[in-house]
């Protein structure tokens, strides 16, 4: 079996994927080691062809084909923090597309018309190649109508107290709610 992650297939059926040589925490930053992920291509056929697309000693991840299938985008720490890069299959060089600093770019995806989408520092961004990243304004509305639970520890105020026939439980009412408490397993 071939450990493949983040697979992207172009119209000709050529597959891009990131390899997985071993376990390393996916959230770890600036990891340079022999098990760092690389981008590979797989061309199916009578004689399948596997070709390593990236050579950086650190992490290269999450490849996505450009809509024309002639180049691809991926995340790399090649220039410091994770950013988006573009590369032509078989090329020795790549072009840096985003230039974020301090925090890593994560979760790269692409729409069919070529708009990139990714996460950066807890926000979602889109980018039309050749343009500038645009932060997506997101408003979260809640239809929650329940009141928040307020935890209260009380040592008085119980009413209507009753002990079970075997004496192992006690039931009581406090502030209109009925509670049953084990007298054997008190916590």
Positions of predicted regions on the chain:
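Signature of short aromatic-glycine-proline-rich micro-motifs recurring in repeat-based ectodomains
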Residues: 153-162
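A flexible loop/linker signature enriched in serine peptidases of the S9 family
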Residues: 1-8, 13-40, 44-61, 67, ...
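Loop/turn segments within WD40 beta-propeller blades
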Residues: 110-112, 163-166
């Amino acid at each position: 079996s071939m450990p493949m992650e983040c697979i992207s297939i172009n119209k000709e059926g050529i597959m891009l994927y990131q390899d997985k040589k071993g376990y390393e925490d996916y959230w770890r930053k600036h990891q340079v080691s022999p098990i760092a992920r690389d981008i590979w291509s797989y061309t199916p056929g009578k004689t399948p062809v596997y070709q390593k697309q990236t050579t950086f000693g650190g992490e290269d991840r999450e490849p996505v084909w450009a809509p024309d299938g002639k180049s691809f985008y991926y995340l790399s720490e090649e220039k410091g923090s994770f950013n988006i890069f573009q590369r032509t299959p078989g090329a020795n060089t790549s072009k840096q597309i985003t230039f974020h600093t301090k925090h890593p770019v994560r979760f790269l995806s692409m729409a069919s018309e070529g708009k990139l989408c990714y996460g950066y520092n807890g926000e979602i961004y889109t980018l039309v190649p050749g343009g500038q990243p645009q932060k997506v304004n997101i408003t979260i509305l809640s239809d929650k109508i329940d009141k928040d639970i307020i935890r209260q520890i009380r040592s008085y105020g119980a009413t209507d107290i009753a002990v079970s026939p075997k004496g192992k439980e006690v039931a009581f009412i406090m502030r209109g709610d009925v509670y049953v408490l084990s007298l054997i397993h008190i916590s």
